Amino acid sequence: MGSGYAKKKKEAKIMEQQFLEMEASLLEKRYEGQAGNGLVSVVINGKCDLISVKVQPTCLDPEDPEVIEDLFRAAFKLAKEQMDQEMSLMRSTMPF
């Protein structure tokens, strides 16, 4: 019984280390979404933190601010979809 417990404890320690490494790598990953043929682009990390937003001045219309809002939402959605796909793949390879 003792050796089985030690083995499980060692496996748990390895899984914990893998999880911590994966979590740290999420901060380094970058996912970009663009909308309006590149008029707006956003970059997020693997924790869905917004890293950068770029807006081309040609899409700034004071008469129609909803355009920029729509483009921002679309770009963010694309970046998040990329992140979600990769996270799903990463989870499928985890042993737990």
Swiss-Prot record:
Gene Ontology cellular component terms for the protein in this record: bacterial nucleoid; cytosol
Molecular functions (GO terms): DNA binding
InterPro entries: YbaB-like_sf (IPR036894), YbaB/EbfC (IPR004401)
Keyword flag Mitochondrion: no
Key words of the record: Cytoplasm, DNA-binding
Protein's cellular compartments: Cytoplasm, Nucleoid
Domain of life of the native organism: Bacteria
Main location: cytoplasm
Function: Binds to DNA and alters its conformation. May be involved in regulation of gene expression, nucleoid organization and DNA protection.
Family: Belongs to the YbaB/EbfC family.
NCBIfam families the UniProt entry points to: DNA_YbaB_EbfC (TIGR00103)
Oligomer and partners: Homodimer.
Protein name: Nucleoid-associated protein CPn_0039/CP_0736/CPj0039/CpB0043
Organism, scientific name: Chlamydia pneumoniae
